[in-house]
């Protein structure tokens, strides 16, 4: 897919690249030199936060942050509706860990945080 805007598939760059897709987009629009697109770690995982069937409660963000302080949470301020994309979470993989195991563990951690924000945990 070609998108002439920042795209969901690049949201990981907010926390996992030297220059995020949003900064790159602004640089391109303003005819400025592009920044480095190098990753800051071997991998970054991103999990979408979709509206769940139940309200996660007013303390969901605090519970999500307490569950895993290394996860970066990006919520969009949208009203909740089942299936609606409300945000995403990113987790940069530890560069010293075994890549395959670290990615699987990071994905599980990011999914657990997304479940809290969705109202499923």
Protein language model features and the residues they cover:
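Active-site proximal loops enriched in glycine and acidic residues that flank catalytic Cys/His/Asp
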Residues: 1-2, 75
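Intrinsically disordered, low-complexity acidic/polar segments
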Residues: 9-11, 56, 82, 98
């Amino acid at each position: 897919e070609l998108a002439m805007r920042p795209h969901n598939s690049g949201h990981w760059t907010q926390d996992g690249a030297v220059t995020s897709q949003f900064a790159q987009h602004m640089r391109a629009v303003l005819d400025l030199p592009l920044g480095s697109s190098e990753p800051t770690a071997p991998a970054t995982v991103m999990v979408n936060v979709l509206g769940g069937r139940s309200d996660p409660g007013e303390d969901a963000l605090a519970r999500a942050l307490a569950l895993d302080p290394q996860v970066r949470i990006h919520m969009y301020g949208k009203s909740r509706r089942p299936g609606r994309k409300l945000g995403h979470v990113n987790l940069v993989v530890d560069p010293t860990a075994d890549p395959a195991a670290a990615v699987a563990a990071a994905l599980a951690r990011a999914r657990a945080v997304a479940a809290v924000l969705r109202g499923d945990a």
